[in-house]
């Protein structure tokens, strides 16, 4: 809803993407108003479940041709479909994102291994130091660990601010990694 209210395509991309394969976004976007200080120079909405559609739209626009450079040149010069899902997400962040941007990432961890998540943290840090802002919907304790991150946890009781080590995702992941045998026994034995 935040992405649509900010003017992004519901399926993802920059504000210039206007394709639609299926109208599945929440009507919540009509009920919120955004307040911003200044206007971002750049922006992108990465929605994990429809990033394939964004990559397809880029390829279609490039195949149709135009008067300028190919769109994929802004994404590392290769079709995002010619890369693994994780490689394409990292390529997007490293090549397309720039300073003074607003980047909305919806479950980027769906495509990324733990090592790639750490690469994303490094790339994000460089962009934050160039006055970019990230709003991330994630289940990843690795991404939540970003220094100074404001974390909000959604539950049946509503939305509340949470400390990193008090998030459900951190607690459950730590419990599993601290004693996988015990957790597996609990989960798998009847």
Spans of model-derived segments:
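Short loop immediately C-terminal to the Walker-B catalytic DE motif
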Residues: 109-110
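Conserved P-loop NTPase mechanochemical-coupling segment
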Residues: 55-83
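Structural recognition of the conserved hydrophobic beta-strand(s) that form the central parallel beta-sheet
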Residues: 103-106, 133-138
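C-terminal lobe/lid and adjacent interdomain/linker elements of RecA-like ASCE P-loop ATPase modules
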Residues: 115-133, 140-190
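GG-anchored amphipathic helix commonly corresponding to the ABC/SMC/Rad50 NBD signature/C-loop
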Residues: 75, 79, 83-105, 115-127
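ABC ATPase nucleotide-binding domain signature region
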Residues: 1-63
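Short, well-ordered loop/turn elements at secondary-structure boundaries
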Residues: 39-40, 98-99, 131
């Amino acid at each position: 809803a935040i992405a649509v209210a900010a003017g992004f395509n519901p399926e993802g991309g920059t504000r210039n993407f206007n394709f639609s394969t299926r109208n599945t976004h929440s009507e919540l976007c009509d009920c919120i108003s955004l307040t911003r200080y200044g206007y971002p120079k750049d922006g992108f909405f990465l929605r994990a479940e429809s990033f394939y559609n964004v990559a397809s739209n880029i390829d279609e626009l490039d195949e149709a041709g135009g008067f300028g450079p190919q769109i994929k040149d802004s994404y590392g010069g290769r079709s995002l479909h010619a890369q693994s899902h994780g490689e394409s997400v990292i390529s997007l962040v490293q090549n397309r994102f720039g300073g003074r941007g607003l980047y909305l990432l919806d479950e980027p961890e769906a495509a990324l291994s733990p090592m790639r998540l750490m690469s994303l943290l490094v790339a994000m840090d460089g962009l934050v130091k160039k006055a970019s802002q990230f709003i991330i919907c994630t289940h990843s304790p690795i991404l939540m660990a970003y220094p100074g991150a404001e974390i909000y946890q959604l539950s049946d009781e509503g939305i509340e601010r949470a400390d990193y080590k008090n998030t459900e995702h951190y607690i459950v992941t730590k419990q599993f990694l601290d004693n996988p045998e015990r957790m597996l026994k609990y989960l798998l034995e009847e």
